[in-house]
Curated annotation (Swiss-Prot):
Its EC number is 2.5.1.41. This is Geranylgeranylglyceryl phosphate synthase. It comes from Thermoplasma acidophilum (strain ATCC 25905 / DSM 1728 / JCM 9062 / NBRC 15155 / AMRC-C165). Transmembrane segments: none annotated. Cannot use Mn(2+) or Zn(2+). Keywords: Cytoplasm, Lipid biosynthesis, Lipid metabolism, Magnesium, Metal-binding, Phospholipid biosynthesis, Phospholipid metabolism, Transferase. Mg(2+) binds at D23, S52. Gene3D superfamilies: FMN-linked oxidoreductases (3.20.20.390).
Length: 253
């Protein structure tokens, strides 16, 4: 059976990927499930559960169980701390906030979670996490040395270091609810030299923004706030998903 990472890599080779981020600290389990169900209808490829809110494993269990009862999509944990783990998920982004000024977020939470995770039969996906200006909550909580949104050299330096460390993915984050996203020029420059997939999230609210990032080379686009705040998640997400899938089709052709 194909692993979650293998499925991701296959999808990025053949086009572009959209992921929907759901924060179980912001919504009750059944509402998380409704968002996931409508996101699947809109064409999203994976569901991420987590975010900047620090919640416990019980809340993660409840949210993920509710989501998996409503959708066939793979569920990936996007942890904000060592407490945000669950055996109910299909995979977890085992991630390091490389530009944090605190070792707790570079490796500390990861060490605390390692033994509990070893007992869980979920896939662990090594991912480098880089927080850009303005950073929002995750930048503040994670004590990030924010990368300017248009700083190509710093972004490339971190991304290459991540690749050389052996991370399988790199995630460029502007922060949940950010007024703007990481610059297209940064994504374009990094993709010229990087061999591993680039995920971009934060501040992506429109089909035009998502399409521009996909055209710049982003392999995966993450949206979260727009889904959480929309009464009709399908109507909010479908145009965004379609915009990046169109770029993916042109990539194949």
């Amino acid at each position: 059976m194909m692993t979650v990472l293998e499925d991701m890599l296959r999808k990025t080779r053949n086009g572009k990927v959209h992921m929907t981020l759901i924060d179980p600290g912001a919504k009750p389990p059944q509402e998380c499930a409704r968002i996931a169900e409508e996101a699947e209808m809109a064409g999203t490829d994976f569901i991420m559960v987590g975010g900047s809110t620090d919640i416990d494993s019980r809340a993660m269990d409840e949210a993920i169980s509710a989501i998996k009862a409503k959708t066939d999509l793979k569920v990936i944990i996007f942890p904000g701390s060592s407490l945000m783990i669950s055996p109910k998920a299909d995979a977890i982004f085992f991630m390091s906030l490389l530009n944090s000024g605190s070792l707790e977020y570079v490796v500390g939470h990861q060490v605390k979670a390692a033994i509990p995770l070893s007992a869980m039969k979920i896939e662990k996906i090594p991912m480098a996490y880089l927080v850009f200006d303005p950073g929002m909550t995750v930048g503040r909580v994670g004590k990030a040395h924010l990368i300017p949104r248009d700083d190509e050299k710093t972004a490339l330096s971190y991304a290459l270091a991540a690749q050389y460390f052996g991370f399988r993915l790199v995630y460029f984050e502007a922060g949940s609810g950010s007024p703007y996203h990481v610059g297209e020029n940064v994504v374009r420059r990094v993709k010229q030299e990087l061999d591993i997939p680039v995920i971009v999230g934060g501040g992506i609210r429109t089909p035009e923004a998502a399409k521009a990032l996909a055209q710049a080379g982003a392999d995966m686009i993450v949206t979260g706030t727009i889904a959480e705040r929309s009464v009709n998640v399908y109507e909010a997400l479908h145009p965004i998903v379609e915009s990046i899938k169109e770029v993916g089709i042109s990539k194949i052709q």
